[in-house]
Amino acid sequence: DCLGWMAGCDFNDNKCCAGYVCKKHPWCRYDL
C-alpha cells in the first residue's frame, strides 16, 4: 500500500505512491 497526495510520509519517499516525493517535507507531493 502506498500513500497518495498530502498523506503523511515522514520524509520517506518510499512510502509515497509513484509520482510523489517526500524528501524535503512530511507529506507526499507531486514530483514536479
Swiss-Prot record:
Secreted recorded as keyword: yes
Compartments where located: Secreted
UniProt keywords, alphabetically: Disulfide bond, Ion channel impairing toxin, Knottin, Neurotoxin, Secreted, Toxin, Voltage-gated sodium channel impairing toxin
Cysteine-cysteine disulfides: C2-C17, C9-C22, C16-C28
Transmembrane segments: none
Pfam families linked: Toxin_12
InterPro entries per record: Huwentoxin-1
Major localisation: secreted
Family classification: Belongs to the neurotoxin 10 (Hwtx-1) family.
Protein name in the entry: Mu-theraphotoxin-Se1a
